[in-house]
Amino acid sequence: MTDIEKMISGLIYDPADKELAEMRQAAHILSKKYNDLYENDDDRNKILDKLVPNRGTNVYLQGPIQFDYGCFTEIGDNSYANFNLTCLDCAPVKIGKNVFMGPNVSLLTPVHPLHVQSGKTQDEDIDKHK
């Protein structure tokens, strides 16, 4: 099982996995580019096409936005997010149709180990990538 499969299944995974790290960095770069554009700039939709490819029509994200991956998020038609949408989509996030989100909404899927031994293993994995 790959670390991506583990992650989206809610299992312990290596967040420093090369493929995951590259995907996360790409999403962070696209989020930054989106945030740097004026809201009437047509390039915002081109960025969202790459960042959140699983979205319906007439989706508007006010910005600023922040996604961990973007590709694990689905947004239904006619949905709107006000300022400061944060979506840590380490597991699938599904936003339905006709959803209106206020400012400062955070959709957070990461789960950190609660058992000491599990935490030690993950800490050791993180330390080796410093």
Can you describe what each PLM-predicted range is?
Residues 65-75, 80-130:
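Flexible, glycine/small-residue-enriched loop-and-beta-strand segment within the central core
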